[in-house]
Design a protein with these regions (language model features):
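TPR alpha-solenoid repeat register
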Residues: 38, 72, 106, 140, ...
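Canonical tetratricopeptide repeat
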Residues: 41, 75, 109, 143, ...
Length: 388
């Protein structure tokens, strides 16, 4: 739901709402109703019971009696959506709107399909049409705000989330959305404000994703000790939660307590043994605690899976630490050509040249990085020291 972990490990899924619209409430429950109404009511009852095949059969019978029946077309769209066949569902909803423009159920379903197909601009367009008929629907306002967030439209997204809070103070979906929105734009303090409101509402049974999201805010703000508390709380709920394990390991890494991070990297690798990012992080941890043999083995394990620049960097740093400067320089020079904007490579290469008393080459390497127009304090400080 909340973030893409470093180097694109994986992303949590957003909370999706179930549809608040239910056509079954519109059908009369009196005796003597006509055949279409009876079929429609039975179809939607089957749909609610998740008997999708039987529901579809009822809706198709309706189309035999009335080929453009709005309830049948929407019902078939809903059935397809339940099967996660969004394209098929969208076709049914669109067909309904051809003959019944402004049909709320078709508009809602179509917009939801577009959202699930990541066609957010189209989803927004349809939801805006829906709001012309129902301009106080909190769920739709929240979904439109979510869609604006997905296309990185901060102002419109925030405006609609806040509109929901005007209608319903402390609406959890709006608060969660505002947390995501500010987090996406690196406004971590603001994101923290909204997610903590959710925590205050239900501190005992809060969703684990809120705990990891709050932890991630503190992690991003480099308040690692505060992040540890929330990641530990998350792991109390689920000891194998990826985001709790990753966050806790990364916080200990940030606090320079690599010896504590290792067991959490290992816990992730038990579930995902071929995760190169985690392998390189664990290799770094062993390197920092001085277990160079173990670190080298783990970096190589990552490279056996596939090329990984961080594993190569780790091996080069090991060479430098062990005084194998020529080997480190060769490796870092090749790596620099493949990843020209990674400042760490330039710093490590310059440090190798400093150790081999080649000050001019160290300066040349650092100046080469600055030619890309990227400001980096560490590069500037080392360069200034060398030039003075």
């Amino acid at each position: 739901m909340f973030e893409t972990v470093e180097h694109g490990v994986r992303e949590q899924n957003d909370v999706f709402f179930s549809s608040p619209l239910d056509p079954i409430h519109e059908f009369p429950h009196t005796e003597g109703v006509d055949e279409l109404t009876k079929l429609s009511r039975e179809g939607y009852l089957f749909l609610k019971a998740n008997e999708i095949d039987r529901a579809e059969a009822e809706f198709k019978k309706m189309l035999e009696l009335d080929e453009n029946n709005n309830y049948a077309l929407v019902g078939l769209g809903d059935a397809a959506r339940k099967r996660n066949k969004c394209k098929e569902a969208a076709d049914y909803y669109s067909e309904c709107l051809r003959y019944h423009p402004g049909n709320n159920y078709a508009l809602f379903g179509l917009a939801d399909c577009y959202k699930n197909m990541n066609l957010y601009a189209k989803a927004i367009e349809i939801w805006e049409q829906y709001l012309e008929h129902d301009n106080a629907n909190i769920t739709v306002f929240t979904r439109v705000a979510d869609a604006y967030r997905k296309i990185h439209d901060f102002q419109n997204s925030k405006r609609l989330y806040l509109k929901v809070l005007e209608i319903e103070q402390d609406n959890p979906y709006a608060l969660i959305g505002l947390g995501h929105l500010h987090y996406d734009f690196k406004k971590y303090r603001e994101a923290l404000f909204y997610w903590q409101k959710i925590l205050e509402q239900n501190s005992e049974n809060v969703d684990i994703r809120i705990l990891t999201s709050i932890g991630n805010c503190y992690r991003k703000m480099k308040q690692f000790d505060r992040g540890v508390y929330y990641f530990e709380k998350a792991l109390e709920k689920d000891p194998n939660n990826f985001y709790g394990l990753f966050g806790l390991a990364d916080c200990y890494r940030g606090m320079k307590q690599q010896q504590h991070s290792i067991k959490y990297w290992e816990a992730i690798l038990k579930k995902d043994p071929n995760n190169k990012v985690i392998l390189t992080r664990m290799g770094d941890a062993y390197r920092h605690i001085g277990d160079y043999e173990k670190a080298e083995k783990i970096y190589q394990q990552a490279l056996d899976i596939d090329y990984d620049s961080y594993a190569i960097l780790g091996l080069a740093i090991l060479c430098k630490i062990q005084g194998k400067y020529d080997e480190a320089i060769t490796s870092l020079t090749h790596l620099m050509q493949a990843d020209r904007r990674n400042y760490r490579i330039y710093l490590e290469l310059a440090d190798c040249y400093i150790h081999t008393n080649e000050k001019a080459k160290a300066i040349e390497v650092l100046q080469a990085f600055q030619q890309y127009g990227i400001k980096n304090q560490a590069i500037s400080e080392v360069l200034s020291t060398l030039q003075n």
